[in-house]
Amino acid sequence: MAKADLDKDPFDVASMFDDVGKNYDLTNTVLSFGQDRVWRKRTRQRLDLKPGEKVLDLAAGTAVSTVELAKSGAFCVACDFSQGMLAAGKDRDVSKVVGDGMQLPFADNSFDAVTISYGLRNIHDFRAGLKEMARVTKPGGRLTVAEFSTPVIPVFGTVYKEYLMRLLPQVARAVSSNPEAYIYLADSIRAWPSQAELAREINQNGWSDCGWQNLTFGIVALHSAIKPEN
């Protein structure tokens, strides 16, 4: 996948993440200055899971996010298109399923809630992905999307863009087995919709009542919505 090619071929994306699975969690912690742990906890809290609920964690990668969700007592399923990523998390005691975000291997109305963290950008057609997540969610069920977003403080936003363009690729080359994956990450973040634009897309593709919460000055935003009852 070329540096500036954000028209994502699913198999290119899967192969890219297969290559980084072994060191993925450590690399993310380094690149986020340890904020990834905070963001996972806040995602769990935002989803407001109850013991016994059935939850889909899409684009779960090594399932570190799924383990965090499972602290709620819910039954959590990790689903990812990258077999290499799921294999890297083989020792994490949660259910794991290989699946494409545009054609999920689950029946209609299977889950009480669904979440996707930093993976919606990587679905070939993210609008189709939103509709597919709605399909497998029960009426009245919840969605939380954790995704990199637009910083809300202008000066901080300028610093953040400089980090994405200059420092992140350099750090990735030092700590990642596939730095091109993180160059793609930086490019895709810059091309991603703002908080308000993404909320509008979510409301137009299978969900309703979407709102969001900014984390770390808007570097990350948690978008939450409900699947309509009818």
UniProtKB/Swiss-Prot annotation:
The keyword Methyltransferase applies. Disulfide bonds: none annotated. The keyword Glycosyltransferase does not apply. It comes from the Bacteria. GO terms for biological process: menaquinone biosynthetic process; methylation. S-adenosyl-L-methionine binds at T62, D80, D100, G101, S117. It catalyses: a 2-demethylmenaquinol + S-adenosyl-L-methionine = a menaquinol + S-adenosyl-L-homocysteine + H(+). This is Demethylmenaquinone methyltransferase. It comes from Corynebacterium glutamicum (strain R). The gene is menG.
